[in-house]
Amino acid sequence: MSAIWGIVDFCSGQTDTQRKNRAGSLKEEALRMRQAYGTSCLDRIQEKTQEEYYLACGVQNVTREAKEEAFPYEKSEKNGEGGSLFVADVILDNRRELAQRFVSRRDLCSHPDGEILYESFCRQPRETLAVARGAYACAYLEPGKQLTLFNDAVGNRSVYYFREGKRVYFSTLLAGISCERETWEENTGWFERFFAIRDLRAVSEPRETPYAGILRLAPGEIAVFTEEGVRRSDYWDPFAGRKLLQGKTEAEYRELVTTVFRHCVEDVIREGRNGIKTGILLSGGLDSNAVAGYAAPFLAARGKKLYSFTAVPEEKERSRIPGQYAVEDERRSVELVRSFHGNLEPEYLVTNRGDLLAENRRLRELLEAPHKAVLNLPWMYECYRRAAEKGCGILLSGQYGNITISYGDFRSLFLTLLHQRRWRSLVQEINAYSRKYHRSRKWIWRDLLTAEAGQDHEAVARYMYDKSALRQIGEYEVKLSLATGVVPRDPTRDKRLIALVLSLPPEQFTHAGQERRLVRQYLRGKIPEEILADEFHKGRQGVGSRELLIAQWERICEALPETLEEAMTGENGLTRAGMVRGFYVGLAQEYRRRFEV
């Protein structure tokens, strides 16, 4: 993996003096851009500067092939003029497929990821975008003609860009562009939406940033810049031509789901130099356990361990309170996984220590934008740091799994059957649910008949490919990766899995009194049975952070004056959710003051 940045000047038809002046200013801007990456965990920087462009790539030697990258890759036309150049922040999941399908060179299979993607894109750009899988953001330059920026379909990586006059600036880090001016105008709409959303979503659209004029590639987007302007388009839409896979047997559905998901997990695990290891953010939940269920055996077959990182409270084994759904200490679940797989080496991170205000201020600068996950991001960042210290190059997770591999919701199924007027199936499903969970049938029917529109399976399916959510997750992961040198990979948001879950009938996710069936039924034998069978508890990571917030509340309010007012929620007064909101609003208002002149 890596970071990319650069400047392209489309100015033409000038005198020699004017060209020299522009080339001189471009070199000065290039130097400032390079300095913006001074604190990033990069193994080396490769760059090229000409009068009309500057292209750079900071490489991280995470995979075995990364050390052989030679950016920018370059081709000349037969007459020695024109040609193209290419820089990429890339790790491919289907290297061999691209090399053999589009390049027809078997020897290329051993070459670096960036070279494979470049050779493939040069020959068949549209087909390459349709087939390529992995985490990547790329810049393809045809000097004097156009600059093309594109990223992977699910936004694992991306790039910011800004156009001023005839110049285009692009950068993996926002600082690579913001460093080119002393003052910027704020994007008022971005802040208004940030404050208006009452949950932990920081963004509601996939392109805008806090800086007016600076945009970011949305997941699965391609942007083409010329002297005249820019053309943007989406190259992957899993909803286009979507059809449900009806009529298969239960065994066929199981085989389809397990085969696709196994490939999603195994394809992101790469061999690294110098014994680079594979880690995982592991809880007692189904998402990360689904990933571990395939990652651990895959690594064990190669004589390797899987290193897990879990946030826990300081006091060991907080007892489960009878009737309480949330489990505050997930050590017990992780130890079950360790016994089950044999090659898991867990590490526990205590979350009720530290200075929440100082940590979130530091994270705000690292993420280059206000964030809302003020309780979770500090311990997640610590997991990345610990993974780096342990020598992990890849850090697996199951962040997107709730809406893909482990999705399932009774109410959504009931409403779907109701809207489809499938009365017999609806009665059977309600009866099964009522018997298992001891819920009144009358209460269930009343709830369904008074439910608002937009809550059935079709409505939920729209979130299976949610560009705003994918952008937010990917944006945080890229910044944490550049700060620590660890590359995050989440198989639960592989585009193959997203396309698959969008094609499955609603009953595959929830049926006969059981929800989240893709994991609970189809992954039996891959996850400890005690975890699969426990439908009445859910792990709660970062419990100690909540306790820290209460203990440090007065000091936070003194440092951030807007915090207390925002935290007061009407008649309810001061609630924990209100405290979280007050905290992130106070941090965002403090960040916003940098735009004041």
Q: Which residues make up each language-model segment?
A:
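Cysteine-centered catalytic environments shared across enzyme families
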Residues: M1-L349, G525
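Short, hydrophobic/amphipathic alpha-helical patches that form generic packing surfaces
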Residues: A3, Y118-S120, E192-L200, E382, ...
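Polar, surface-exposed loop/tail segments
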Residues: P112, I116, R516-Y522, D534-G544
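Structural motif
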Residues: D107-P112, E127, W184-T188, A453-M464, ...
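Residue-level detector of well-ordered alpha-helical segments, enriched
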Residues: G213, L497, L518, Y522, ...
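PAPS-dependent sulfotransferase catalytic core
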Residues: D409-F410, I527-Y584
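ATP-dependent adenylate-handling active sites, centered on carboxylate activation for C-N bond formation
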Residues: V8-G24, P143-K166, E227, D237-A461, ...
